[in-house]
A protein has these predicted regions:
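Periplasmic solute-binding protein
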Residues: 1-15, 171
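Conserved redox-cofactor binding core of oxidoreductases
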Residues: 15-134, 140, 203-224
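Structural detector for helix-capping/boundary residues
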Residues: 25, 105, 122, 152-153, ...
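Acidic/polar loop patches that form or flank catalytic/metal-binding clefts of enzymes
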Residues: 23-24, 76-79, 120, 175-179, ...
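Glycine-rich loop(s) and the adjacent beta-strand/alpha-helix scaffold that form part
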Residues: 30, 127, 135-229, 233-237
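FAD-dependent oxidoreductase catalytic-site/capping-region signature
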Residues: 28, 34-82, 89, 209-212, ...
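Conserved, well-structured core segments
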Residues: 1-5, 153-157, 165, 382, ...
Length: 414
């Protein structure tokens, strides 16, 4: 539900990578047409997607994160500005205390259209390709195989894992990969499923004597109270996201652009014997950091012609020297925030007391051991100029196949 103003440099990078027309000015115009920002101070934008400023509803403990940011001379992000650099209260895609998704904005209002047919619980198995043109799809619903044909275009929006999987299952992709999986080659497009990128974050927990979300919803009475408050008034801890303060910062004064993302949340989690995570009863907070611009590239490739067999995913994380350095800097940033007077004054103890003393080698090993995905996979059908190093052009059309586009995060160049 988090909604950030992107950095204009991100889209400059996209244009340099061959995504013509995806520069900041063009994308900003699209953002303005998509979003409707709601706050007590000001409203702007006329788009269908609601973006709410919930800063006044955030947990009181979060003010300590803001104080730490001021201590480190970080700016306070302005969500109307070009740059979201700094640490601030997160704006969210909510309305009246409820999640407001892209489906709420676009799909639900269109359900009554005569030219829209929604088929639920269906699995698309492959595309129907004839003479280098996508004519339809083969799908299964209720154990019955069916076909659907397109007069104009087919748009894949199955995500950074599903879209390259479907292309490869349809015979579009690297010849050797398809051959091993037993899929007949229709169109050799070597970068389908290649170039996978994702964000990895490391998180550290700290105990505190002050009240946090653990105090509010970490016990039975608190959960019932919060639930009733939400049902009756659409307010309280269940009406705002757990991720309350976040932003983008520079790992050093030499950094040209913000290259780390910080999350600071008034909550900690515990794990039971079955490995299930839950909100602990004792008050605590977490500090999390992730490098924003990893350079390593992985892959997603099918291992069978059966759509029900998951593809092989190789993240190839921390493969480059730069990524290893940034992993260390992410850990160092958590050390820096934790050492501010603002955070030390409310910290009872660190759950990992040795972390503050780790040298660079120990920090890298700690990142390798504990970092986890932030679920931002992308780039597996990336935009570009040439079929030799990309899958689609800047209009999201698949190289060499007519009437076929890919419209999801797999299209990101980086």
């Amino acid at each position: 539900m988090q909604c950030y103003s992107e950095d204009e440099n991100d889209f400059s990078d996209w244009e340099k990578a061959g995504a013509e027309g995806w520069g900041w000015k063009n994308v900003l115009a699209s953002y303005n047409a998509l979003e409707n920002h709601i706050s007590k101070k000001e409203n702007y934008g006329n788009g269908p997607i609601c973006v709410s400023d919930l800063s006044e509803q955030m947990h009181p403990f979060s003010k300590h994160f803001m104080a730490a940011a001021r201590e480190l001379n970080w700016p306070k992000p302005n969500n109307t500005a070009i740059s979201s650099e700094g640490l601030g209260y997160v704006h969210n895609t909510t309305r009246n205390g409820k999640r407001f998704s892209s489906a709420d904005a676009f799909l639900h209002p269109a359900k009554k259209r005569k030219n829209l047919h929604i088929i639920k619980n269906a699995i698309v198995e492959k595309l129907i390709i004839n003479n280098s043109q996508s004519d339809g799809i083969i799908y299964e619903v209720n154990n019955v195989k069916k076909c659907a044909y397109a007069n104009k275009e087919i748009i894949l929006s199955a995500g950074a894992i599903g879209s390259p999987q479907l292309l490869q299952l349809s015979g579009i992709g690297p010849e050797e990969i398809l051959k091993k999986a037993g899929v007949k080659l229709v169109h050799h497009l070597p970068e389908v499923g290649q170039g996978l990128q994702d964000h990895l974050a490391i998180t550290k927990y700290f105990m505190t004597n002050e009240r946090t979300l653990n105090s509010d919803i970490g016990n039975f009475v608190g959960k019932v109270t919060a639930g009733l408050r939400y049902l009756l008034t659409k307010s309280g801890p269940l009406s705002v996201p757990v991720n309350q303060t976040s932003g983008f910062v520079r790992s050093s004064v030499k950094s040209i652009v913000p290259d780390l993302q910080i999350y600071a949340n008034p909550i900690i989690y515990s794990t039971n014997n079955n490995g299930k995570t839950y909100v602990g009863k004792k008050s605590g907070f977490l500090l999390s950091a992730q490098p924003s611009r990893f350079s390593s590239r992985g892959s997603i490739n099918i291992q069978s012609s059966d759509v029900n067999i998951p593809p092989l995913i190789n993240p190839n994380s921390l493969h480059t020297k730069y990524d290893k350095l940034m992993a260390i800097k992410a850990c160092q940033m958590i050390q820096t925030i934790a050492a501010t007077k603002a955070m030390e004054s409310v910290t009872k103890k660190a759950c990992d007391p040795n972390f503050s003393k780790f040298d660079n080698d120990a920090l890298l090993n700690n990142f390798r051991e504990l970092a986890s995905t932030v679920y931002h996979p992308c780039c597996t059908c990336r935009m570009g100029l040439s079929p030799s190093d990309s899958v689609i052009n800047s209009r999201l059309q698949v190289h060499g196949i007519k009437k076929l586009r890919v419209v999801d995060a797999s299209s990101f160049p980086n």
